[in-house]
Amino acid sequence: MTPKKMTHYQRHYHITTFGCQMNKADSERMAGILENMGFIWSEDPNQADLILYNTCTIRDNAEQKVYSYLGRQAKRKHENPDLTLIVAGCVAQQEGEQILRRVPELDLVMGPQHANRLEDLLQQVFDGNQVVATEPIHIIEDITKPRRDSTITAWVNVIYGCNERCSYCVVPNVRGVEQSRTPEAILAEMELLGKQGYKEVTLLGQNIDAYGRDLPGVTESGRHQHTLTDLLYTVHDVVGIERIRFATSHPRYFTERLIAACQELSKVCEHFHIPFQSGDNDILKAMKRGYTHEKYRQIIDKIRDYMPDASISADAIVGFPGETEEQFENTLKLVEDIGFDQLNTAAYSPRPGTPAALWDNQLSEEVKSDRLQRLNHLVAQKAAERSQRYLGRIEEVLVEDQNPKDSTQVMGRTRGNRLTFFKGDINQLKGRLIKVKITEVRAFSLTGEIV
C-alpha cells in the first residue's frame, strides 16, 4: 500500500456502531482517540475521510448489514484512494484476514481488545501498511477521554470478555477471556465523570456480576476479594453521580449479597437486566447456560422480596436447535409468570464457530418466526400490564433530551428504566432529576406532568 498523508483535508471521521452497549462504549473510546489525533466528527459518512464500522456478530443479519455498508464505501475508495476504511469489533475479530478477501479495500481490521490501540494501528496504516490486529492481548487501560454521545449519562467498562461457553454464542471467541479493571481505575473514571457533570453511570460487562474473579485476593470467608457488590460500595459515594446502573448480569453469579447491596445503596437503580434465554431446563442445558428455570425464578423472587417494585428486563431466544413446541411453551409460561418490564427477543441464528451451529436438529425459519411472533405478543401484553402500576404515581425522571417527535416535550428515564415524556423546556431541565406524575401508560413508555 502507498503511504497515506495526514494532510489538512483528511481530518473528518465517522463511526457506525452495531450491537451491544459494550460496542457503544468501545466506539466512544475510539472516537476520543481520533479526536485526540485531530480528527473532526462528520455526521455524514460520505463526507468523512476515515470511516470506522464497529461491528456485531451475534446475529447474521447484523453481520450482513456490515458487508453491505462496506461494499458501498469500497466503491467510494476507488474514487478516493486516500479514504481510510476500518472494520472493528466482533466481525473483525471473528473473520480476521478473511475479511480482506471479501473487501480488499480495507486499511485496518481490528478486534475489540485492540480498541485502545487505535492510534498506534492507524500510524501503521498511514505508513502504508494494511493492518490486521486480532491477536489476543491484555487490554490496555483507557488512556484517552472518550467522545461520549451524552453529557448526562455515561458507560463505564468494568470487565471485558467472557469465560462462559454457551453453545450458541460467539462472544468468548471474539472478546476473549474475562479481564476486570481495577476498582481504583473505575473509581477514578467515575470521579472524573462526576466533575464533568454526568448524572448517571452504567457499569458495563458481558457478565458484569462475574467482575473481579480474575483479580487477586480472597477474603477470610473464601470469596473473591473484589466483586461487583464490593465495587458498588466503592463507587457509590462519588460526588455528582446521582444514579448507578449495571448490565448485563448472568444468573449464575447473581447473589443475594448483591441484591441486598442494591437495596441498601440509594444511588443504585431498581432495574435489573438478567437474561434467561429459555424457560425449559433441557434447552438451557443444551445451551450450556449453567442454571435451571427454577434457579432463575428464585433470583427474581429474591429481588422482589428486597425491592417489590423493581423492574426486570431480560433476553430470550426462541427456535434453538431441537426446541419442541412444549419446550417453547415453557418459555411462554416463564414470561407469563414473571411479568417482565422489557424483554429482548430473538430467533436463534446459527453462528460460525459455535457448537450449536453444527447440530443437525435446526428448526425451520417458519417455525422460528412463528414462535418469535407469539412470544413478542405475550411480552407486549405483560409489559402493558406492568405499566399500569405507574398510573397516577410520582416518578423521579432524569431528563436526557428533547422528544424528537414533539419539541414541547422532554424525555428521560425513571429509576426503573421506563422512557418517560412530559411537557418542559429542555434548556432548563436537561440533566435534572424531576418529579413527574404519570398520567398515561403504554407497554414500554410513560407520559406525565411535572409535579
Curated annotation (Swiss-Prot):
Occurrences of domain TRAM (ranges): 388-451
EC number(s) from the headed UniProt entry: 2.8.4.3
GO molecular function: 4 iron, 4 sulfur cluster binding; metal ion binding; methylthiotransferase activity
Keywords, comma-separated and alphabetical: 4Fe-4S, Cytoplasm, Iron, Iron-sulfur, Metal-binding, S-adenosyl-L-methionine, Transferase, tRNA processing
Binding site for [4Fe-4S] cluster 1: C20, C56, C90
Residues annotated to bind [4Fe-4S] cluster 2: C162, C166, C169
InterPro entries: Elp3/MiaA/NifB-like_rSAM, Methylthiotransferase, Methylthiotransferase_CS, Methylthiotransferase_N, Methylthiotransferase_N_sf, MiaB_methiolase, rSAM, rSAM_horseshoe
Native species: Rippkaea orientalis (strain PCC 8801 / RF-1)
UniProt-recorded name of the protein: tRNA-2-methylthio-N(6)-dimethylallyladenosine synthase
GO CC annotations on file: cytoplasm
Subunit text: Monomer.
